[in-house]
Amino acid sequence: MPTEDYDSKPSWADQVEEEGIDPEPISPPVTKVQQDPASFVLDTPQEVINGKIKTITEYKLNDEGKKIKIVRTFKIETLKASKVVAHRKNWKKFGNSEYDPPGPNVATTTVSDDVLMTFITSKEDLNNQEEEDPMNKLKGQKIVSCRICKGDHWTTRCPYKDTLGPMQKELAEQLGLSTGDKEKAPGAEPEPAQAPVSKTGKYVPPSLRDGGSRRGESMQPNRRADDNATIRVTNLSEDTRETDLQELFRPFGSISRIYLAKDKTTGQSKGFAFISFHRREDAARAIAGVSGFGYDHLILNVEWAKPSTN
């Protein structure tokens, strides 16, 4: 059988067996990691404690490859902490600080100033918008008027009370006017004459008794009109009197009735009152002017009175 001659190249394994030389192991390429000179510490940091001063000295290489010396000085302070904080400081460290002694390590911990946190409890603090002071609305408005000098103060606190007061009374007496006649509202109906009261003990018919000819208060036609022009004042002091309310609300219009709630035992004010005006417009101006006004170290609250259900 004919055979074909050809040149065969011996394999690499046959050559190794013939020569008896062990092949070199194939190893992966080695990558050389260059260490940052700034983080390379030449020597172990030296720690010296002198009283309450702690000094740590260490040597490093900077970016230019030069040897530098770093000295850190700490002041040791002893602070009292709660049990929870002391227990937290004894926790086992982990990571790069696993074998560090107690306390912060300058290599892994940065000690800085304390940061104070402010907790916001409501949305009003976020806006920080200054609300308008209700007292600013009353600036320039003449709420109180003195009867003696027409000044912006109470009559009882008038500096001319002892001089002008007697002169005005004497002049009114000379002109035939009384204080009660001056304070009456214009157009007011005169009060009916009272019937004589029997002092002999004889029987008097109801029609001839005092007030027998007058209608009941609930039958008056203008009672509902008074309810529509009645305001309610609250947060009054205990020393408030009807005369004080008269002086306070008289500048706004003619007043038909004032009711001040009082304690039956002490006679002091209970803190609220009802003022009825002849016109509803005057009552509205009184609410706008006196509501929020400071009186006797208290802030008055004035609102419309609810109509009576009786």
Curated annotation (Swiss-Prot):
SUPFAM superfamilies for the chain: RNA-binding domain, RBD (SSF54928)
SMART domains: RRM
Biased composition range(s): Low complexity: 187-196
InterPro entries (UniProt xref): eIF3_g, eIF3g_N, eIF3G_RRM, Nucleotide-bd_a/b_plait_sf, RBD_domain_sf, RRM_dom
Name under which the protein is recorded: Eukaryotic translation initiation factor 3 subunit G
Keywords, sorted A to Z: Cytoplasm, Initiation factor, Protein biosynthesis, RNA-binding
UniProt KW RNA-binding keyword: yes
Stated family: Belongs to the eIF-3 subunit G family.
GO molecular function list: RNA binding; translation initiation factor activity
UniProt GO cellular component terms: eukaryotic 43S preinitiation complex; eukaryotic 48S preinitiation complex; eukaryotic translation initiation factor 3 complex
The UniProt record lists the keyword Transmembrane helix: no
Ranges of compositional bias, category Basic and acidic residues: 211-229
Role, per record: RNA-binding component of the eukaryotic translation initiation factor 3 (eIF-3) complex, which is involved in protein synthesis of a specialized repertoire of mRNAs and, together with other initiation factors, stimulates binding of mRNA and methionyl-tRNAi to the 40S ribosome. The eIF-3 complex specifically targets and initiates translation of a subset of mRNAs involved in cell proliferation. This subunit can bind 18S rRNA.
Transmembrane segments: none
Gene this protein is translated from: eif3g
Subunit note: Component of the eukaryotic translation initiation factor 3 (eIF-3) complex, which is composed of 13 subunits: eif3a, eif3b, eif3c, eif3d, eif3e, eif3f, eif3g, eif3h, eif3i, eif3j, eif3k, eif3l and eif3m.
RRM domain ranges (all copies): 229-307
Chain intervals for the UniProt region annotation (Disordered): 1-32, 179-229
